[in-house]
């Protein structure tokens, strides 16, 4: 759980910072496919036709919402480090959700501690390695007063999100958790529209409908 949580955060955030966000998110949200396979191996959960239908609907919705204006040529760009990191992040996130469910007999405090330790440990190791290699600059501690409120706010948001995730993931089948998590794509798109960073077009409506249908099927299975 420590390794899975830490790798998820480090890989996904690194990928977003260096790659095309649309492409990274789309590759990351292949996560339900990994979840179905890992759940079969680690939890002996059956792969039912309904589970496959929910995964297909969710991925179709994500593809429609995230399809770039440039068309298929943008999705077919050369495979990059960001692409690899996005795939690693999605696989690790699926493994994280399954491990949370597998360790559901442990206290929520223990699971939360493992996730936070993993996030800090793996991200710290990656940061130190990249700084030593000269790929990223050292933090500007003299200007800490300018960025620490934002850092504190983000930390609080991550805390709330992780607590909600482990509460739900420990009580739901892994494949259902994976598909429900796809609603993040819809929420992100809607937030962009509300903040004036996007428009409410046919693609968003159609893709959002697919994602909501997938989540609805998961909730009522």
Where is each model-derived feature located?
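Specific transmembrane alpha-helical segments of multi-pass solute transporters/efflux pumps
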Residues: 1-23, 64, 156-172
């Amino acid at each position: 759980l420590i390794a899975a949580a830490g790798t998820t955060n480090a890989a996904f955030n690194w990928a977003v910072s260096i790659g095309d966000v649309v492409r990274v998110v789309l590759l990351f949200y292949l996560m339900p496919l990994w979840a179905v396979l890992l759940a079969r191996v680690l939890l002996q959960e059956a792969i039912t036709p309904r589970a496959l239908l929910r995964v297909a609907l969710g991925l179709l919705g994500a593809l429609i919402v995230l399809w770039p204006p440039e068309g298929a040529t943008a999705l077919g760009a050369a495979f990059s480090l960001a692409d690899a990191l996005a795939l690693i992040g999605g696989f690790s996130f699926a493994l994280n959700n399954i491990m949370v469910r597998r360790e559901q007999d442990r206290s929520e405090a223990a699971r939360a501690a493992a996730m936070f330790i993993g996030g800090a440990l793996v991200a710290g190791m990656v940061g130190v390695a990249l700084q030593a290699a000269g790929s990223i600059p050292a933090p500007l501690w003299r200007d800490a007063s300018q960025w620490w409120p934002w850092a504190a706010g983000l930390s609080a948001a991550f805390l709330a999100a992780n607590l909600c995730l482990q509460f739900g993931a420990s009580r739901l089948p892994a494949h259902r958790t994976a598909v429900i998590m796809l609603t993040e794509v819809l929420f992100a798109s809607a937030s962009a529209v509300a903040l004036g960073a996007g428009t409410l077009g046919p693609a968003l409506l159609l893709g959002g409908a697919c994602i909501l249908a997938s989540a609805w099927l998961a909730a009522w299975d």
